[in-house]
């Protein structure tokens, strides 16, 4: 028995967590921000945490860790229709998006200095938008954010026109597979067709899509795809960028070159093991999950609208694999500040979101809703309820019971435009 095993064997253990007690446990409706880890992923990760070995080392412990990494790479690739050599491990979705956007821009521009344009959409996650803005400011990139319709769906004809204006100057196209705020699924086949007709590579942020809708990298024709573990029931701090083998990328950071010489850093074998297990299970269960979660989502929307008749749902109303993510319910509540509603619901033990958790706390209206044509007041008056593998009918019941009084209280407090002290007063 090694020192760690001895410590674990004799350390006092707390009692295992009990089953849900609805009176005290929170109702978690924020799966789009992060979904609870699957028990199988926890077990896979825990099994490796008690083992020592750098995957880059040549001794037996290192080779064992390397075997875990490579087997995990193969499992993830098989689950999403990719080749193992195409899976580049990263620290998560944000790093993957940065590597895709910056790395591809630099590589393509180095090949041909005319390639300075990047085409994307106005509803991307900030993990794509912010690197684009950085490239525009520091590298002279010509970033063009293409319009979307009132459902947040890309105008493919606008993309076609932008490409045909001068396709030889476009370094890349980046369009998210599914929107993280309103759940709208983009017409990725059309995007790939338009871009590839001019030899332009396409990146997609599929963080919200993997495990929710069918994702097949090879069949999609995409060149780069971002995914992350904590959105599919895996651990935080690990993700991947899937890159076609023939595509060149410039690295963001330099060091050991562990991942195809485009990503350096010691690989986290335990987290990668948990990641692989989560991806496998999420993809395997996707079809059954879709039907169950769609039904719960539709029930939630119908009953919330019955409680608050002037509320409105944002995004594509159809729950289908080519229209909207199954667990996304994004609603505008007129006369209420979204942050205020969030705090009032949180005080009742219900967790939801006003949008992307990565930008939560920033007092700005949703850029996604603004791009969809909503005004600032509407963009500030919305909540996202996102359902996932732990969601039950009792969770929906709890929200439906709370939403009417919460909206009434928020409106009575007169909090529109002043979420800060007024929201805290309403919540208290």
Predicted regions span which residues?
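Pyridoxal 5′-phosphate
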Residues: 1-428
């Amino acid at each position: 028995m090694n020192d760690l095993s001895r410590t674990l064997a004799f350390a006092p253990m707390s009692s295992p967590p009990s089953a849900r007690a609805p009176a005290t446990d929170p109702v978690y409706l924020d799966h789009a921000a992060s979904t609870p880890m699957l028990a199988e992923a926890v077990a896979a990760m825990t099994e490796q945490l008690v083992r020592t070995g750098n995957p880059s080392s040549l001794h037996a412990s290192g080779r064992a860790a390397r075997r875990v990494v490579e087997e995990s790479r193969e499992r993830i690739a098989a689950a999403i229709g990719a080749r193992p050599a195409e899976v580049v491990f990263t620290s998560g979705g944000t790093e993957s998006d940065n590597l895709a956007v910056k790395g591809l821009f630099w590589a393509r521009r180095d090949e041909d200095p005319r390639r300075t344009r990047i085409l994307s959409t106005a509803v991307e996650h900030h993990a794509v938008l912010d690197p684009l803005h950085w490239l525009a400011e520091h590298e002279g990139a010509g970033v063009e954010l293409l319009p979307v319709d009132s459902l947040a769906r890309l105008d493919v004809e606008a993309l076609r026109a932008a490409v045909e204006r001068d396709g030889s100057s476009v370094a890349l196209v980046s369009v998210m597979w599914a929107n993280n705020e309103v759940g709208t699924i983009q017409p990725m086949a059309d995007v790939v067709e338009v871009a590839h007709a001019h030899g332009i590579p396409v990146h997609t942020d599929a963080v919200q899509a993997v495990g929710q809708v069918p994702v097949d990298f090879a069949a999609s024709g995409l060149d780069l795809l971002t995914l992350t573990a904590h959105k599919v029931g895996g651990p935080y701090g690990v993700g991947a960028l899937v890159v076609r083998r023939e595509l060149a990328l410039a690295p963001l950071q330099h060091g050991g070159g562990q991942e195809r010489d485009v990503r350096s850093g010691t690989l986290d074998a335990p987290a990668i093991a948990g990641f692989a297990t989560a991806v496998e299970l999420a993809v395997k269960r996707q079809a059954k999950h879709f039907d169950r979660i769609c039904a719960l989502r539709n029930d939630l929307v119908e009953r919330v609208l019955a409680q608050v008749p002037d509320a409105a749902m944002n995004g594509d109303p159809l729950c289908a694999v080519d229209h909207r993510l199954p667990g996304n319910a994004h609603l505008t509540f007129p006369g209420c500040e979204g942050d205020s509603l969030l705090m009032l619901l949180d005080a009742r033990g219900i967790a939801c979101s006003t949008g992307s958790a990565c930008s939560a706390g920033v007092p700005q209206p949703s850029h996604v809703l603004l791009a969809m044509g909503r005004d600032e007041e509407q963009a500030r008056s919305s909540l996202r309820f996102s359902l996932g593998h732990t969601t039950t009918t009792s969770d929906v019941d709890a929200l439906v019971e709370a939403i009417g009084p919460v909206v009434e209280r928020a409106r009575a407090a007169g909090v529109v435009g002043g979420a800060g002290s007024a929201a805290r007063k309403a919540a208290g």
